[in-house]
Swiss-Prot record:
The keyword Nucleotide-binding applies. Acts as a component of the MCM2-7 complex (MCM complex) which is the replicative helicase essential for 'once per cell cycle' DNA replication initiation and elongation in eukaryotic cells. Core component of CDC45-MCM-GINS (CMG) helicase, the molecular machine that unwinds template DNA during replication, and around which the replisome is built. It comes from Dictyostelium discoideum (Social amoeba). This is DNA replication licensing factor mcm5. The lineage of its organism: Eukaryota, Amoebozoa, Evosea, Eumycetozoa, Dictyostelia. Residues 606-625 are annotated as: Disordered.
């Protein structure tokens, strides 16, 4: 092998009937063929079953033209053959395929020729090679890599044997196209030279006879390093995968896989190649086998001693307190938020209904509050300890970057699908900071991903559905930066997005001398300890790979556990426990939901009724239609409490979510989401006729002073109306009513009032 994937076409005589195959000077090795044939026929498992011979027979009878072979078995059978295959797979693959054909001929006595090639798929237990460390020394060798598929092309036909005919003399020949990413170059000169009349054949005389050629399916994937394996500060690396035959159309973006293949190179297109004079080559992997990689989806291996330690730990009375204390221990306070985050890490139980519908078990969490309350630090901590996680900022995220996009390849003009953050984080957590800074249209794009946990794409002729089984942990600031106790001045999100969050926490920074003293002391202690230890004092730059780490009771402290122990305990609980509600818990949750709905209705009636006592009837009716709770109470909130109850049961390794778990879930819901609802509906003052008259005066003033299509600053409105003797509440109420009627709208983060009609 020369290193470059050249010599793409091999010729086998005239007439298109096969002949002797040349493969870059390699002559077919009959000893390799016979040896591999013996391996398929003679290899037995522990039950004395000829597994490969039986597998080949079953697959061929079912019309499945492939066989899966373990390289570990091949090594045990003949180490020299295995070693030669690993170092020179391209040379041995034709002999292996011919050996399979021979075996099928022996199985089918009435058939002299096998109609279709049998694809050999390989698997290995060897450790994968990092994508960023694939170097020139591995070219043309068998390598194993792992990562996440971020894009996939459409499957297209690729010729394996191409029959061509000269337009002048009708001479035909068969071209054998090598597998992988290669270009099919037709001969420029006719071998015969002239026709029967002596007329010479021109240059480039051949045309392809498609009806006599054979084709295989080929698909191109892009494999990227898993987010948790990328070193801090480094860009993720990727490699192109070439899949053919039975492997095509099996993998979608967002899937984590381990790939066994031959490292090759092809000519890269675009400006880079032009600048380098055509010498640039791009790595790719010709795939010989794919296995699903569930390492991020809680598939760690646990020793018996670890399982025993987990069971003992789960029976501790202070289990929830210990786990909550282990969530971002460097951050003071926020005990209930940490409990909610621990529930999110454990997750509820996903369910598949008889009608094929799926109910999500992942928990979504929103932190809304003042700056400096450690919201971003909590997100960063979760990003580092979750098995799969993606951290992004709302300002720098687009709808396509979060969900999926259809990209056009510049060199070929072909469209392919590329998954975004919520596809890459399938099975983990997406942390979105500055959630309030996102464009409204971009937030709408993640509605389906947050509830149905799928992403539907219908662009550029590509129609598909991608999995997005992720939890969302988002952090946002109120409208004016800091939380304002006045009504409707804080949450500026649509109810459609808010209803998809299971828990919504209002995080305030109250000015309390005693609390400020405790926090300052805590922060200073952290800095002092960090200085003495000479380290960063946090897990911020570490990614814990626990697949080969054994944890024991030494990782359990008096008030908290180590990150290693917590992460492995979470993986154990998620993989082994799928709780269901007890009868008592069902009754408790049902009664609570009915009660909360009644309270929400009462609160809404109070808000709507606050416009009563006189005034225009149409104005009152308009307000009743327009003004609703920012955070609605729907069936989604009932499902949220169910998921939290299940996560609390999973936390204690209990298969049943009891009444006690349900009560704790209700408590978390009441102090978060329901508290946020009542906090944002604090205006329940009954308006007197005098107050209503003042509101109408303010409305008339604004309509007279602001022409349609013009704006006025809220600061100027307050200043001018206050000079007329109107109080702050009356001014805000008048503005709020005008906005509710859709006559005015807020702009520039509620600093400007624009008149629409």
């Amino acid at each position: 092998m020369s290193g470059f994937d050249e010599g793409n076409v091999t010729v086998s005589g005239g007439g298109g009937k096969g002949g002797f195959k040349k493969n870059n000077g390699f002559v077919e090795d009959t000893s390799v063929r016979d040896l591999f044939k013996r391996f398929i026929n003679e290899w037995k498992d522990q039950d004395n079953v000829f597994i490969y011979k039986e597998q080949l027979r079953q697959h061929y009878n079912l019309g499945w033209h492939y066989i899966e072979v373990s390289i570990d078995h091949l090594t045990d059978f003949n180490q020299e053959l295995s070693g030669r295959f690993i170092s020179s797979p391209n040379e041995l693959m034709p002999s292996f395929e011919d050996a399979i054909k021979d075996i099928i001929k022996e199985m089918n006595y009435n058939k002299e020729q096998v109609d279709e090639d049998i694809q050999i798929l390989f698997k290995s237990s060897a450790n994968p090679e990092p994508i960023r460390y694939l170097r020139a020394g591995l070219i043309s060798k068998l390598v194993k890599v792992q990562g996440i598929v971020i894009s996939a092309s459409r499957t297209q036909p690729k010729p394996s044997t191409m029959v061509v005919k000269c337009k002048n003399c009708q001479h035909t020949q068969t071209l054998h196209i090598r597998p992988g990413i290669v270009s099919s170059v037709l001969p420029q000169q006719c071998e015969r030279g002239s026709n029967d009349a002596g007329k010479p054949c021109p240059n480039n005389p051949y045309v392809v006879l498609s009806d006599q050629s054979t084709f295989v399916n080929q698909q191109i994937l892009k494999l990227q390093e898993s987010p948790e394996t990328i070193p801090t500060g480094e860009m993720p690396r990727h490699i192109i995968l070439s899949l053919d035959k039975s492997l095509a159309d099996k993998i979608t973006p967002g899937t984590r896989i381990k790939v066994l293949g031959v490292l090759g190179i092809f000519e890269g297109g675009g400006k880079r190649r032009e600048i380098a004079g055509g010498t640039i080559r791009t790595n790719y992997l010709r795939v010989l086998g794919i296995t699903s990689d569930n390492a991020g989806r809680d598939s760690m291996h646990f020793t018996p001693s670890e399982e025993q330690s987990f069971k003992v730990f789960s029976r501790r009375q202070d289990l929830r307190n210990i786990i909550a204390s282990s969530i971002a221990p460097s951050i003071y306070g926020h005990e209930d938020i940490k409990r909610a985050i621990s529930c999110q890490l454990f997750g509820g139980s996903s369910k598949k209904l008889p009608d094929k519908m799926r109910l999500r078990g992942d928990i979504n969490l929103l932190l809304l509050g003042d700056p400096g309350t450690a919201k971003s630090q909590l997100l960063k901590f979760v990003e580092k300890v979750a098995p799969i996680s993606v951290y992004t900022s709302g300002k720098g995220s687009s709808a396509a970057g979060l969900t999926a996009s259809v990209i056009r390849e510049p060199s070929t003009g072909e469209y392919y699908l590329e998954g975004g953050a919520m596809v890459v984080a399938d099975g983990g957590v997406v942390c979105i900071d500055e959630f309030d800074k996102m464009n409204v249209d971009d937030r709408v794009a993640i509605h389906e991903a947050m509830e149905q946990q799928t992403i539907s794409i219908a662009k550029a002729g590509i129609t598909t559905i991608l999995n997005s089984r992720t939890s969302v942990l988002a952090a946002a600031n109120p409208v004016y930066g800091r939380y304002n106790d006045a009504a409707d001045d804080n949450i500026n999100f649509q109810s459609t997005i808010l209803s998809r969050f299971d828990l919504i926490f209002i995080v305030k920074d109250p000015k309390n001398e005693k609390r400020d003293f405790i926090i300052s002391k805590h922060v200073i202690n952290i800095h002092e300890k960090s200085s003495r230890s000479g380290g960063s004092g946090s897990v911020g730059n570490n990614t814990y790979d626990l697949s080969n780490t054994v944890v024991d009771d030494s990782h359990i402290g008096e008030n908290e556990v180590t990150i290693q122990y917590l992460k492995k305990y979470i993986a154990y609980a998620r993989s082994r426990i799928s709780p269901r509600l007890s009868e008592d818990a069902v009754t408790t949750l049902k009664n609570h939901y009915v009660s909360v709905r009644a309270k929400s209705k009462e609160q809404e009636m109070i808000n709507n009724g606050s416009y009563g006592g006189g005034g225009s009837k149409n104005s009152v009716e308009t307000e009743r239609k327009k003004r609703k709770n920012a955070i609605p109470i729907t069936v989604r909130q009932l499902e949220a409490i169910i998921r939290i109850s299940e996560s609390l049961a999973k936390m204690s390794l209990s298969p049943i979510a009891t009444n006690e778990h349900a009560k704790e879930a209700i408590r978390l819901f009441d102090i978060s989401t329901f508290d946020a609802i009542t906090t944002n509906n604090t205006v329940n003052e009954t308006l007197t006729p005098e107050r209503l008259e003042n509101i109408r005066t303010a409305e008339k003033y604004l309509k007279d002073r602001v022409p349609i299509g013009s704006s006025i600053r809220i600061k100027d409105v307050r200043f001018q109306l206050s000079r007329s003797g109107l109080d702050h509440f009356t001014i805000l109420k008048a503005v709020d009513i005008l906005v509710g009627r859709d006559e005015f709208e807020f702009r520039n983060q509620k600093r400007t009032l624009f008149r629409k009609q």
